Regions:
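Hydrophobic, aromatic-enriched alpha-helical segments typical of multi-pass transmembrane helices
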Residues: 1-196
Length: 196
């Protein structure tokens, strides 16, 4: 539970306060921004992707718990857990790619690496959307007390599934990520209350 809450906070602070690249800019401009401010870039990447990976592993554990409990939603939860683990691996790859952008020997190489990371990022948004939709569905089907969070997770999942078609720098993507954070905090709070 706490891992979800800490992950959300770390991700927000990392991406907003430290990460120097603006997702609304062209790939070459984003790569140049990372290379121009290495310290801020490293801190932003560690906090941003670190928080995201923490959230993904925590959500994977929640999904596994729902799956283990059995019931109507267990099959959806199993797929969600698998997807969250894949997305966490993709986030690690993106972290490595953007670290490589900072240390690239040429601007052209940095732009190529940045473009690859952004492409994987679009796929991750789709994956998070599908996994969150499935987790929300499994929560609703198990009827285990936090149905509002389950319903909200379904809405967030749908928003994130359509977000990549609009681009990473659009309001709908921002809305999806904000919703994902809120849903994750809701799941985290319920997990903490359940463990007490």
């Amino acid at each position: 539970g706490w891992l979800l809450i800490v992950g959300v906070i770390s991700q927000i602070v990392g991406w907003i306060a430290f990460y120097p690249a603006d997702p609304a800019k062209e790939t070459s401009v984003q790569a140049a921004a990372l290379r121009a401010d290495e310290t801020m870039a490293y801190v932003g990447l560690i906090m941003g992707f670190g928080g995201m990976i923490a959230m993904l592993f925590a959500l994977m554990n929640v999904a596994k718990n729902v799956q283990t409990a059995g019931g109507q939603g267990s099959s959806y939860a199993g797929v969600a857990a698998f997807l969250f683990s894949l997305i966490a691996a993709a986030a690690l790859v993106c972290t490595g790619l953007e670290f490589s952008v900072i240390g690239a020997s040429s601007d052209a190489g940095a732009v190529t690496l940045m473009g690859t990371s952004l492409s994987i990022g679009n796929a991750m948004i789709l994956g998070v959307g599908l996994a969150t939709l499935l987790l929300g569905t499994s929560i609703l089907l198990t009827k285990n007390g936090y149905l509002v969070v389950g319903g909200f997770a379904i809405l967030v999942g749908i928003v994130m599934l359509i977000a990549p078609f609009f681009g990473q720098d659009t309001p709908i993507t921002g809305l999806g990520f904000a919703g994902w954070g809120i849903a994750s905090i809701g799941i985290g709070v319920h997990s903490i209350k359940s463990s007490d």
